[in-house]
Amino acid sequence: MIYTRQQLEEYESQTLASYAVHSKDSKGRLHPEEEADFRPRFQRDRERILHTTAFRRLEYKTQVFINHEGDYYRTRLTHTLEVAQIGRSIARSLGLNEDLVETICLAHDLGHPPFGHSGENALARLMKDFGGFNHNSQSLRIVTVLEARYPDFPGLNLSWEVLEGMVKHETDYDITEAKQFNPELRGHLEAQIANLADDLAYTSHDLDDGLRSGMITPNQLDGIALWEIINESIGRRRSETLDSLSRHQIIRRLINFEVTDLIQSTDRYLRRSNVKTALDVQKLPFNVAGF
């Protein structure tokens, strides 16, 4: 059996929450294109990002530890994949558009330079007389201009909702380009979830990498409420050595704890806010996704 794009969009209408962004309701693309026969818009956007040069280049870009310190530690690429996995899991539980969340997650770090935030700060200083440098702005520039893959338009010609989600990655006024994307409105719920998935991914895996490298010791974390809760859940006492199995258990339970809290809290806020549509979410005076 073959499912056409229209059938997949109809399936979205039947299964996604009313406050989710539905593919068929997209504002479209800057440059008109024929729709795909078998892929909804955001699935198509996701696949365009995966095939970019910028996405492949994330492999050797620093997250925290530079590459020669070991192949265990996260890079921008592995971080991005973990963000996408967490974002998609949350989206599924909340009835959101998984393809849209994952697409924003996959695109959110495309503009990062080498050497992590140190590299970004160095570029910002060097470019201060020319508008500075911001990795969020660069991510948008990559997908709208620099990735030259089509003869009829610059960039990837991604859907409006993907670009809006990238622009409003942290707040509704993240970068100057936000003025093109209804700055008076907050990001749609898929954008809010993508942002929080980023936070959850880097806090958990930075802790994992820090503990494995020895730069963070368990003694430094003793007394922190969440650390104590997670350790108690696996039956580990303060005096015990943190072996690799215990570390993996802790990180796994930490991610599950935070994801569960985010899903339950966001659902609670949605019910209290009585939102019915994606636009209702954007008109709220606060981000409805949270802990």
For each feature predicted by the language model, list its residue ranges.
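A generic membrane alpha-helix/interface feature
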Residues: 113, 126-127, 216, 274
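His-Asp-centered metal-binding catalytic motifs of divalent-metal-dependent phosphohydrolases/nucleases
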Residues: 94, 98-119, 139, 198
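Short coil/turn segments at secondary-structure boundaries
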Residues: 67-78, 91-92, 106-114, 127-130
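Short helix/strand-bridging catalytic loops that position acidic/His residues to coordinate divalent metals
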Residues: 121-129, 181-183
